[in-house]
């Protein structure tokens, strides 16, 4: 008997969870640990989280006060459970209010556990953080992990068809489009530590782009230091093309959340509109029936990692 652990980023369901969400995220040393000495880390970033909460709350107000990522992940877990005919337990990494229920369900599970982080590309700061969480909180339950799927044929074909369907629904010809494939950025210091994220993103982009005209860019920078480039904002500012449409494809996100619904729509799209382009943001694949069946095929065919130390931030 196999139990599947479906792990996603998590997000505040209501405005009341914004502070705890930010504290869980910013005090995670896999995310921000390289910036300051460990003794100062938790108190400083707890303070920063509280200071940033009102600003972030105004962004979430555009989404109705909370993120849809929780419900989308729960729905995907239910649908994937039906597809796999097995138990699928959802996990929301930075929604601490849900952790006890997840840990209890895993503790009571029988047989092996396979972890499925919903991130196409592996990075110490996200998938590595999820793996570390369970090594710390559930050490008696070994979990094998599917650590990336960005070039898996099922993911590539699902995304390509999703893009075509979205454009066809708006009667937009692919030939009239320039594609901006946007993925979450990462500090370059992580790459110097051996993080494979940039290489995996590039390979995934090349597989997805195929014959389309476009480029890759990195969004969502925060904090100090140099990040992967070019940034999505810089590309939007410098972009010159004769194509009528700019199509933004957030291919590193399988769920819509603040970085697609607010950041792209409110920070990047206006730059392109001012340049008189027509702009389309491709929605994330979320819990669509095509993605459910594709994800099930990925789960059935992907190798599982059991040697976990190399997967963690050094």
Swiss-Prot record:
GO CC terms of this entry: cytoplasm
Pfam families found in the cross-reference section: Ferrochelatase
Enzyme class at the top of the EC tree: lyase
Tagged with keyword Protein transport: no
GO MF entries: ferrochelatase activity; metal ion binding
PROSITE patterns listed in its UniProt record: FERROCHELATASE (PS00534)
Compartments in which it is found: Cytoplasm
Keyword Signal recorded: no
Binding site for Fe cation: 184, 259
Function field: Catalyzes the ferrous insertion into protoporphyrin IX.
Protein name: Ferrochelatase
The species this protein was found in: Chlamydia trachomatis serovar L2 (strain ATCC VR-902B / DSM 19102 / 434/Bu)
């Amino acid at each position: 008997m196999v139990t599947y652990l479906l792990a996603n980023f998590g997000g505040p369901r209501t405005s009341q969870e914004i502070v705890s969400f930010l504290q869980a995220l910013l005090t995670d040393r896999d995310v921000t640990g390289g910036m300051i000495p460990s003794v100062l880390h938790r108190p400083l970033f707890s303070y920063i989280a509280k200071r940033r909460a009102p600003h972030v709350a105004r962004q979430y107000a555009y989404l109705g006060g909370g993120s849809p990522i929780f419900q989308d992940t729960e729905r995907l877990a239910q649908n994937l459970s039906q597809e796999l005919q097995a138990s699928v337990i959802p996990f929301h990494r930075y929604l601490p209010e849900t952790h006890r229920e997840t840990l209890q369900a895993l503790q009571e599970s029988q047989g092996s556990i396979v972890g499925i982080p919903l991130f196409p590309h592996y990075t110490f700061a996200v998938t590595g953080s999820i793996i570390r969480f369970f090594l710390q909180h559930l050490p008696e339950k070994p979990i094998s992990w599917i650590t990336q799927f960005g070039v898996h044929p099922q993911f590539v074909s699902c995304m390509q068809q999703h893009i075509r369907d979205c454009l066809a629904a708006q009667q937009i010809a692919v030939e009239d489009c320039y594609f901006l494939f946007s993925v979450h950025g990462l500090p370059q210091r992580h790459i110097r530590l051996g993080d494979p994220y940039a290489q995996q993103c590039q390979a995934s982009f090349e597989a997805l782009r195929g014959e389309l005209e476009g480029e890759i860019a990195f969004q969502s920078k925060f904090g100090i230091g140099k990040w992967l480039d070019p940034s999505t904002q810089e590309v939007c500012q410098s972009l010159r093309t004769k194509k009528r449409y700019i199509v933004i494809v957030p291919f590193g996100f399988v769920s819509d959340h603040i970085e697609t619904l607010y950041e792209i729509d409110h920070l990047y799209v206006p730059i392109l509109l001012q340049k008189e382009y027509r702009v389309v943001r491709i929605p994330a694949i979320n819990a669509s029936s095509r993605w459910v069946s594709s994800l099930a095929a990925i789960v059935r065919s992907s190798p599982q990692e059991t040697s976990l130390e190399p997967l963690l931030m050094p």
